[in-house]
Design a protein with these regions (language model features):
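Glycine-/proline-rich flexible loop or hinge segments
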Residues: 5-12, 57-70, 118-122
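Polyanion/phosphate-binding surface patch
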Residues: 40-71, 106, 111
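Short acidic, glycine/serine/threonine-rich loops at helix termini
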Residues: 50, 108-111, 164-168, 376
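Acidic, His- and aromatic-enriched active-site or binding-groove loops in soluble protein domains
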Residues: 57-67, 169-199, 331-332
Length: 380
């Protein structure tokens, strides 16, 4: 059994077993028709800052180059592979990759700061093919891990974002809530702030007087600014916040529905029926549920969905840019991180794509450092 490790040390992986696993998985990928792709270990930081924001510096290792500017050690494969794919002519592709990624970890984490990953990315330009590719991605990981005693958990970010889209609030508030879905504490603070249940007129005035007005005064005193935003940008942002806090707040019933939805969990087989009976009946939410039902139906033809878990908010703290179907595989011992995770990231494709290139994508990664000698006890 793998003992809990602190700090950034690697799990003690048997190199021979790990080598066999890598060869085995590579063979599975090749038989499935995937093409190997390589991307640099050192990336241009600006390409990732637009995605992660300044939080990137808290998660990744950055350095400054006198010629190339700010650089970052590869924190994952998805974004650099997507950028590489977008430079090509083909819209459809199925890639697999292997190599190291580097991420800062907390002292208590058992995930090494340098870890070896394998995985894949599917790109497609046919909108009606997304659900089939979701299922294909899940089954590919399921096949790889079939010899291990691992259980899977699934989620669907689209259900939550579509529910937010149906709220009777401004587009600014909707975008703000969706942007912070992956940061639960920030999201809940925003939800409380935008909610009529927790934010009275007095509290709004108090919030404005204690956090916004002083900044207006201080803004006049600043002579120089660091960062991307200009003085005008900051001033406009303060004015927008003032306006948003004074009108169109979230109704109690909508807030309660959203909170209930975020707590929902069941077996995958029971989830469609339970969620479809919800009171939110807007078009966006209905479409998300229809897609969910189709995906579960297709998955049920290949796996026992009664033993697959479903949580609406699964992966929100770790799968930053996923916006649809998400999944993970976990060993029975909950002290370990998910051995594999993946999901759909169409919005990321849309934001990084050039005009005329409308593509969707789903991908998954495997933590190979946990598939060596230290996990042999988990095999059947």
């Amino acid at each position: 059994m793998l003992k809990s490790q602190k700090g950034i040390g690697k799990p003690k992986t048997d190199s021979s077993n790990l080598g066999l696993e890598i060869s085995h998985i590579r063979l599975i990928f090749e038989k499935a028709g995937l093409k190997e792709i390589s991307v640099p270990s050192l990336l241009t930081a600006s390409d990732l800052v637009d995605l992660y924001g300044e939080d990137l510096k808290l998660r990744a290792y950055t350095t400054s180059d006198p010629v190339k500017g700010e650089q970052v050690l590869r924190p994952d494969f998805t974004v650099p592979i997507l950028l590489t794919h977008l430079k090509g002519k083909s819209l459809q592709a199925k890639y697999f990759y292997s190599g190291n990624v580097w991420r800062r970890q907390s002292f208590e984490s058992i995930i090494p700061n340098e870890q070896y990953q394998m995985g894949f990315e599917f790109f497609d330009n046919k909108k009606n093919n997304s659900i089939a590719l979701d299922v294909e991605a899940y089954l590919l990981i399921s096949t790889i891990l079939s010899k291990y005693r691992a259980h899977s958990v699934t989620g669907d970010v689209q259900i939550l974002t579509s529910a937010i889209n149906e709220l009777d609030i401004s587009e600014y508030k909707k975008a703000s809530l969706k942007r912070h879905l992956w940061r639960p504490k920030r999201f809940m603070r925003l939800l409380d702030l935008y909610s009529r249940q927790t934010t009275s007129g007095r509290n709004i005035r108090l919030h404005k007087s204690t956090t916004l007005l002083p900044w207006k005064k201080k803004l006049r005193e600043f002579k120089s600014f660091e960062g991307v935003r200009t003085k005008t940008d900051i001033k406009e942002r303060i004015e927008i916040l003032e306006q948003e806090l004074s009108q169109g707040l979230i109704a109690n019933s909508e807030r309660n529905f959203l909170l209930k939805l975020m707590k929902f969990q069941s077996s995958l087989s029971e989830a469609p029926k339970s969620i479809s009976s919800a009171s939110m009946v807007g078009g966006s939410f209905k479409k998300a549920i229809e897609n969910f039902e189709l995906r579960v139906g297709l998955l049920s033809e290949h796996v026992n969905t009664k033993i697959v878990k479903f949580q609406v908010i699964y992966g929100l703290t770790t799968l930053e840019y996923y916006d649809g179907f998400v999944f993970g595989f976990q060993f029975d011992n909950r002290n370990y991180p998910p051995i594999a995770q993946g999901g759909r990231y169409d919005s990321l494709c849309s934001s990084l794509s050039k005009k005329g290139k409308s593509i969707s994508a789903i991908g998954s990664m495997l933590r190979m450092d946990f598939l060596g000698k230290t996990v042999t006890d988990y095999r059947d």
